[in-house]
């Protein structure tokens, strides 16, 4: 699943590049939009009594991102477990990879305790499974 984003001036560091921490927001937006496209927006998940939280992130920065860049965040699920998923994502500009991320998300109940994800949510995550990223 691909999400297109545009770099905003407020995301730049003093050197004119996107600050490294902003990449995490880009990857998060990619995951959020991928889930929403499958009918699992974050508010809908909350209303059903569970939350999706990030428990681990590894980012590799491959090239600079600058003002006015149009970026694609490509998101795929690499592994689905009953209470977690491992995502692989790429930040691209014109087909060139600028950063990669591997993110583990976990499901919790309203109180923050680990929980098994509903079967329809797990099925949706499996539809995002790909080795392409």
Please tell me what each predicted stretch does.
Residues 49-66:
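Small beta-barrel nucleic-acid-binding modules, principally OB-folds
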Residues 1-54, 110-133:
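Hot-dog-fold acyl-thioester-processing enzymes
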């Amino acid at each position: 699943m691909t999400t297109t984003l545009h770099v905003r001036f407020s995301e730049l560091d003093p050197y004119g590049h996107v600050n490294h921490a902003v990449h995490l927001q880009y990857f998060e937006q990619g995951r959020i939009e991928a889930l929403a496209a499958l009918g699992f927006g974050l508010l809908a998940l909350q209303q059903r009594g569970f939350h999706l939280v990030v428990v681990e992130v590894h980012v590799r920065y491959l090239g600079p991102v600058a003002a006015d860049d149009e970026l694609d965040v490509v998101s795929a699920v690499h592994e689905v477990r009953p209470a977690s998923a491992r995502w692989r994502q790429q930040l691209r500009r014109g087909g060139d990879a600028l950063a990669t991320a591997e993110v583990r998300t976990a499901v919790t109940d309203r109180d923050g305790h680990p929980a098994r994800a509903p079967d329809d949510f797990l099925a949706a995550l499996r539809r995002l499974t790909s080795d392409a990223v």
